[in-house]
Amino acid sequence: MLHKLLAIAQAEIGIREEGGNNRGTRIRQYQRATDLPPGPWPWCAAFVSFCVQQWLIENDVPEWLRLTRSPAQWQPRTALAYGFRQWAKDRTRTTSIYTDKDPAQPGDIVTFDFSHVGIVLEDAGDHLVTVEGNTNGKGERDSETGDGVWRKIRPKSLARNFIRIHPAR
């Protein structure tokens, strides 16, 4: 089922801000997936929240997760990269938190030490292949110069946590 989440995230690769400064029609859609009003704020977490929300629209996903509440109550709405950890802690039946020392799996949400978040495509040993919003196509560590949704390769040492979504236990 996580392949559908990966497909949603990967379909966004290439979306760019319009005029910089965290602006643009699609960027506003990402930001509306959070509890904050759209504005000139970093949107990496909004991108991940948006992707998970779109994934939940798929008819078979809530059933696969075995949700006991509505998808709208389960979905993330955080605009903070580190907010995903609390989101996962509040959903221990359907999420697990792993450290940066654990292997990542495709579909994991990865939080980075520099207050950034993305979706894991692959754990390549000492590097992660991810899809991230509010980043750039350069090899830079942070997202201060972010301008779009990109496929990134980052050192795994920059990861803080992996949040794995799974069927209810």
Regions found by a protein language model. Name each.
Residues 1-69:
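N-terminal capping segments
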Residues 3-4, 125, 160:
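Sequence-level motif detector for i,i+2 pairs with an aromatic at +2
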